[in-house]
Amino acid sequence: MIDQDLIKSGSMHLKSMLASLSIDHNGLILIEDVFTDQIIEKLLKFCIAADDWEPQLTADNKTIVANRKKIAWRYDCIVEETHTILENVTPEICRLIKRDNLVLGGVNLWKDTEGYTIKPHTDNPVIQTSLQVYIQNLPTLSTIFDYDGNLVHTNPNTNAGYISDNLIGIPHWLPNAVPAEFNRYSLHAIWS
């Protein structure tokens, strides 16, 4: 069952956090304290309990991404609740990215398992904006961006991550592989 109070408090929390961010950036915004503690705890419990993770495919839908699984949509649970929260804050995302009429395309939960890593790449510009928030992570698993000639490390802590303007095409990667006996969980949202 959907928790409307959680959605309301989560939307207010995230709107407040986003309102505090500057629009003076070049397409990369590092974020912290994205969701309430209650939402992060609920996301982590959901990820740990889920047994129906699906293979993550590459952008061309032809190749399975090694050691990454996803959950793309679930009704009446934290997946739908976070989708609704992110839908509610889309005007703030538009303001930050300086683009009108972005539409939330969806929310994925990612489960990265032993050996997962990704080489330098840019995201598909069909997805204009993306957000990634770490639900469970390690200090060595920080996404690195090549941003204006500088290497920028995201904060790898739980409930931190980034918002990226994918039309700019900022190269990024995960240099260290997920170690044995650890699952890295994150939430990834896209707007077009």
Which ranges hold each PLM region?
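Conserved short histidine dyad/triad with adjacent acidic residue
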Residues: 109-124
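Short, solvent-exposed loop/turn elements at beta->coil junctions and helix N-caps
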Residues: 108-110, 176-177
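Catalytic core of Fe(II)/2-oxoglutarate
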Residues: 125-127, 137-192
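Non-heme Fe(II)/2-oxoglutarate
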Residues: 2-97
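Short catalytic/ligand-binding loop motif for oxyanion handling, primarily in non-cytosolic enzymes
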Residues: 38-41, 66, 103, 116-119, ...
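Residue-level marker for the onset of beta-strands and adjacent loop->beta junctions
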Residues: 17, 105, 116-118, 150
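Eukaryotic charged/polar low-complexity linker/IDR segments
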Residues: 130-132
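A short coil-to-beta-strand element that immediately follows conserved catalytic motifs
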Residues: 97-108
